[in-house]
Each structure stands twice: as C-alpha cells, then as structure tokens.
Amino acid sequence: MTDDMHKTENFPPDWLLVESLDLEAQGVAHRADGKVVFIKGALPFELVSANVHRKKNNWEQGVVTAIHRESSQRVQPGCPHFGLHEGACGGCKMQHLHVGAQVAVKQRVLEDNLWHLGKVKADTILRPIEGPAWGYRYRARLSVRYVRKKGELLIGFHERKSGYVADMKECPVLPPHVSDLLLPLRALISAMEAMETCPQIELACGDSVTALVLRHMEPLTHGDLALLRGFAAQHAGVQWWLQPNGPETAHLLDEGGQALSYDLPEFGIHMPFKPTDFTQVNPHINRVLVSRALRLLDAKRHERVIDWFCGLGNFTLPIATQAREVLGVEGSEALVARSRQNFKLNQALAPVNKSLAATNFVARNLFEMTPELLIQDGAADKWLVDPPREGAVSLVQALAELHQQKLDPIGHPPIVGAVGWMPPKRIVYVSCNPSTLARDADLLVHQAGYRCSFAGVVNMFPHTAHVESMAVFDLEV
C-alpha cells in the first residue's frame, strides 16, 4: 500500500490497515515508511492495532490486539479450540474468515504465485471446487502426550506454533463420529500400561470403516491389547492397527473384518487402501476433483494417457474407463504393486460392456527424470500429473529439454530416441503447493511449448491456509 493510500485514511499512526493474507493466513499491512507488518488474527480491510514481537529491517511480525474496523467477512469460529489464546489448536488458521472469502484468498494466492513466480497467466480461471466446511477431514495424525505436571493425558493436534499438544475435547473438522472418539480415546490410553510410550494415533476413515493406527514404542501387554479390543467392540466401525516402528510395520490388531476402502461411484471404481497409504484428506472434494480432472483431460477411446505420481490409482483407474491405454508411474515399488492389485480388482468388478483399458504400472524415481527415461515410457496423447509438495520439476524439465532439442537440434546434444517421440498435447496438473506449481508452469510455458489454458483452486482443506489447485496446459501448435 502506498503512502498516498495511507493518507486517505484518517487514523492514528500506530493503527494498521490490513491489505491481504499471506500463505500462513497472517494479515499483511504496511507502515507509512513501507515496512511490511505480518499480523496474526487480522483480516483484509480491517483497521487494527498489533503487538509486535519480532522485528527485522524490512518487516515486523505481531498479533492483533484490537480491531477498530472489522471486516464484513469476519465470522465466529466454529471450534472453541481455535484462536490466538494460550493453548489454542494449530490445526486451523482461518476459521475467523467466512469460508467463501477463504476460497477467494486461496484463488488470489494461486494467481499471484503463477504470475509473480512463473510469469504465467491462465486463459480461463476455473470455478473453485468447494464442499462441506466441517466434518470433512477423513485423515489426521493426532499426538498423544501424558503431561506429568497436570497428571492427565492429552490427544489432539499441536498447539499453534508449539510442540505441545492442544487440550482438545472435540474437533469439528473431523467427521462427527471421529470427533466423538477424542474423549473416549483419552480414557482408553490413560488406562493402558503403555500410556507414556504411545506418542501418536493416526486415523483414516473409509466409506464404512474407521482405522486407528496406534504408534507404540514398546510391546503392548495382553491387558493393553484387551483394552483396545474392548474399545473397538464398543464403537461400531472402529478398527485398530498397531505400528511398532515405521509406517511399513503397521498391521491389523485382529485379522478379518471389513477392509478400509472408498468408492468413486461416477466411474464405478472401488479403492481398497491401508491407513498408512496416501489418500486425499477430503473424500467429498476428491470425488469432484477426479471428475473435473477427467473432464478437463478429455481422454478418448483411441488415446494413450500417462498418470505421473499415480499413487494407488486414484486418477489412473477412472482414466482407464475412458482411454485406450493407461500407464501409471509411481516412485514406490510397494505402491505400484498395490496399484496393480486395485486395477485387477476393478477389472474383475467391471461390467463386460464397461471394461477398463489396458493399464500398466511402473516404478520410477520421478525426482530424477531424464529425457531418455521420458522416451522410455513412451509417447502419450495426454498426461495427468499429481505430485507431492515438491512438485514435478524433474519431469517437466525433461519435457522442456526434449522441446528445446527439437527446436534447435544443432545447438542441443542429440537425445537417443527423440526422433518420432511426441509430447502430450494436454497436461492436467493437480497441485498441493502453488509455488512449485508456478515454478513448473514457468518451465512448461516458457521452455516446453505449452500455454496455461485453465487454472483454479480446490478447497480441499477448509479453514487452513493450504492451497490445492489444478491447472491445464495445452501444447501450442
């Protein structure tokens, strides 16, 4: 904000006019001398006072102490554990902002990142994908800690900017049946001999089963195992998993029972998974996300599609209902094996007149891709790319190198197999980090011969500052 804009507002010099929110959901303001001030708890267009607790040459950071002019988008938080008070939960950052305004903030973050970091502007902004604002979080990692000074055990997320566990009795972003388990879980773990050696419970909800993965540092006694079994018997749909070491050691307490799974009914896909597998936190949004991604991909029955970072096949299997041939590429051999199992299961379940396309899966280190490896996986008409937060820079860099070699074969070393290899005419990129999306978009648009046709946000995590998004890149003819 310029000095002139400050002068148009007649307010005391120590008051701050908030202009926007940053990626941590802090209000961003400027002092009259241009210094940036980040203010926790402040919203855009509010006039506030702040207690500054950190100062640098070019910026300051503080906490709002008074709101002199309130935003029309400020709302009452839906959770008693949210806020700036001591002991407040750090799981959510934006409950004080109307959910529609949260989406607008995330859309601005996406567009700002694309332009300022990648010098890319989408031809068309997609309508945001939105869903339920509460009860959406079907995956969570809850910390468990016995506090000797208080003589009590706590289960919940960490406190805001702290390693301490918040004293949570409920959590409205969890499904109600899971939120209702928080206090019973406290009582359960408090009664166990292993109370002080169980640091974490990871939860994963399927369509009909809730898996609780108990991380335990020491072997559990017969008495503790009996308590876990009794808890599961009292709470319908609860399934205990035990994890003595890393995620790969997680196993069912008792074999049998219903498998953890979710469905993508639009495509007739059934997806079994383990609680330690990566699946989307928000199943409601995931269904809409897959549907939109496939509409944008627009795979035809004569086309070959590659799904990079395919995981368990969340996109791969729906694509197989539309394309001629699909290749799923993933970094983990174990995940590739599981993807193959999921494909075989769905192939067996599919009606004769709706059989899945020929689908293969390969393991590949997607953070060390080369043009030669890209060629080895074969040309495809279209790509779907769904990377982790680190993005897909190695993949798109390899694509850019092939494009540059084609444009200037004399100025670039020859690439074995490049002759006859064709780049995908469309790429649908699903991102969980707008800054790495912008970096990869820069490569695709300015070095690989694509334009950004569409971009938009996906509100996968309401009330948090996490920005999920989707962009479509089309090859320039």
Curated annotation (Swiss-Prot):
First-tier enzyme category under EC: transferase
Reactions mediated catalytically: uridine(1939) in 23S rRNA + S-adenosyl-L-methionine = 5-methyluridine(1939) in 23S rRNA + S-adenosyl-L-homocysteine + H(+)
Instruction: Please list the residue ranges annotated as the TRAM domain.
Output: 7-66
Q: What is this protein called?
A: 23S rRNA (uracil(1939)-C(5))-methyltransferase RlmD
- Which PROSITE patterns does this UniProt record tie to the protein? SAM_MT_RNA_M5U (PS51687), TRMA_2 (PS01231)
Origin species = Albidiferax ferrireducens (strain ATCC BAA-621 / DSM 15236 / T118)
Active site annotation, chain numbering? C432
Which GO molecular-function terms appear in the entry? Answer: 4 iron, 4 sulfur cluster binding; iron ion binding; RNA binding; rRNA (uridine-C5-)-methyltransferase activity
Quote the Gene3D superfamilies the UniProt record gives.
2.40.50.1070, Nucleic acid-binding proteins, Vaccinia Virus protein VP39
Gene from which the chain derives: rlmD
